[in-house]
Regions:
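Acidic donor-binding segment of Leloir-type glycosyltransferases
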Residues: 24-63
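Short alpha-helix within the catalytic core of nucleotide-sugar-dependent glycosyltransferases
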Residues: 75, 84, 98-109, 133, ...
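Glycine-rich, basic loop-to-helix element that forms the pyrophosphate-binding segment
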Residues: 64-81
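Short beta-strand-to-loop acidic/aromatic patch adjacent to the donor-nucleotide binding site
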Residues: 84-95
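Conserved donor NDP-sugar-binding/catalytic core segment of glycosyltransferases
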Residues: 94-125
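Short, well-formed alpha-helical segments that are part of the catalytic scaffolds
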Residues: 11-25
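Aromatic-glycine-rich donor-binding/catalytic loop that engages nucleotide-sugar donors
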Residues: 128-147, 156-167
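C-terminal catalytic/acceptor-binding lobe
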Residues: 151-254
Length: 254
């Protein structure tokens, strides 16, 4: 049984229902963090707790008072279920195909595997083991509201050996397409007014990663990333801080 399968959402709750109905493997707890912050989708999400599901034992809906970002809700999934041996984290606009979850669990059962990715190392679906968090830390919440939090985490094990399973091997949908990211990012696609703010934040987050790990974190830039955050050997790779001024500059307004 999957101990916890978690997601977060800002808008368009029909995607979460689609995700929920696509579950075809036993799950102890399906948790949704409502990142809307405006009380626009509260009632629709609450109804999810009343929907019977053959494979899901518990449904938890957590309405956050304001948006804490992608890395913020990823960390909440980990913290709120701290005794889990692993956490299965997924974008709200994903839909599993039959057999996907069974295959993901099979890969996760390998004790040497630290992370299982959905496809080609993607982070729209991933399984994260507890010992990986112990060694490499939580996600960097400076990367509010979204983008680069996955790439940042990947830099932490550039200079060490971490066994990952890069693809589950069974297709799944992201948005309306299967096998690619062409219709992903449904948060800003569903609410175009957010697009500009999110894209600006994305660029700011890239510059933050330049400082933290060097521009070589990007695949097209030659060189090596720093072995320690901000090229400071006194700092462990698991270090997480919170630059309030930087985060405030990217605030979405809710």
């Amino acid at each position: 049984m999957i101990p916890v399968l978690g997601t977060g959402i800002v808008n368009a709750p029909h995607w979460v229902y689609r995700l929920f109905y696509s579950i075809d493997y036993p799950v102890d707890t399906f948790v949704v963090f409502n990142n809307n912050g405006r009380d626009q989708i509260t009632e629709e999400l609450n109804l999810l707790q009343k929907v019977p599901h053959k494979y899901v034992k518990n449904v938890k809906i957590c309405h956050l008072p304001s948006n804490v970002g992608c890395s913020g809700y990823w960390n909440l999934i980990i913290k709120c279920f701290m005794n889990s041996p692993y956490w299965m984290i997924v974008n709200h606009d994903i839909m599993f195909t039959p057999g996907f979850l069974k295959a993901a669990v099979s890969h996760a059962e390998d004790p040497e595997v630290g992370i299982v990715h959905g496809e080609n190392g993607s982070w729209d679906f991933f399984v994260l083991k507890d010992w990986v968090v112990q060694q490499y830390g939580l996600f960097d919440e400076n990367l509010y509201p979204a983008y680069c939090e996955d790439m940042e985490y990947g830099q932490r094990f550039k200079h060490t050996e971490l066994k990952r399973h890069m693809s589950v091997g069974v297709p799944y949908f992201h948005g309306e397409t299967c096998g690619d990211y062409a219709d992903g990012s449904q948060t800003w696609r569903s609410e175009p007014a957010l697009a500009e703010k999110i894209h600006i934040a994305h660029e700011m987050n890239k510059h933050y990663l330049h400082a933290k790990w060097s521009p070589a974190w990007q695949a097209h830039i030659e060189g090596e990333v720093y072995p320690h955050p901000f090229d400071n050997e006194a700092l462990p790779v698991s270090l997480t801080t919170y630059n309030l001024d930087f985060v405030r500059r990217k605030n979405l307004g809710f």
